[in-house]
């Protein structure tokens, strides 16, 4: 009998969060920039330049911010692991009892918890403490470069749509074309991310469409009233 491995959505949390955030931000922020500029009725080359600048600056900003944020998390994890390693060397018996207590709190009897702690300590003490005491494992472990690349790429991909629309859409209908294409792709992106994460597609689509409309509506209003470009 063949057993199929279960799909666990938590395995996707790290890269999915960065990718969805980047794509949403790239699409929505760049579209909002273009709509804000287009509402002031400028020339096409100004709209294209605004879209390109928004795409490049936004992608770099997302990547840098994600790298710094996840690097801080990684530094904290490394410090915790170093401290745990030192404690295992200096007071192994105390650490063994601490590990056993973790399993007791999860429902094991005192004897079973101690036996599990002993066996896992013999196998790999630091790994056992990192996983079960600190909550650090290969799935949730911080990966700064991976997160930064995902954010940069996803932002650029998201921003590519409004940039492309700015090249081909009629100037007088630019705002409507940008809004229409962006809402459709925001709905698609929301549905994909919800399905990949095991969440409700309907709620995800409604949420992303609502906030997308709010963001684009505000920039269109500001651009129309004041004739300025806002992001």
How does the language model describe each region?
Residues 15-33, 138-164:
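Transmembrane alpha-helical segments and their cytosolic interface motifs
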Residues 172-185:
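Structural signature of hydrophobic alpha-helical transmembrane segments
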Residues 1-11, 70-152:
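Cytosol/matrix-facing amphipathic helices and coiled-coil assembly/linker segments
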Residues 57, 61, 158, 162, ...:
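Alpha-helical transmembrane segments of multipass membrane proteins
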Residues 220-231:
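Juxtamembrane boundary at the C-terminal end of a transmembrane helix
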Residues 1-69:
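Internal alpha-helical transmembrane segments
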Residues 25, 64, 103, 113, ...:
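Residue-level signature of catalytic and energy-coupling elements of molecular machines
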Residues 188-213:
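Interfacial loop-to-transmembrane junctions
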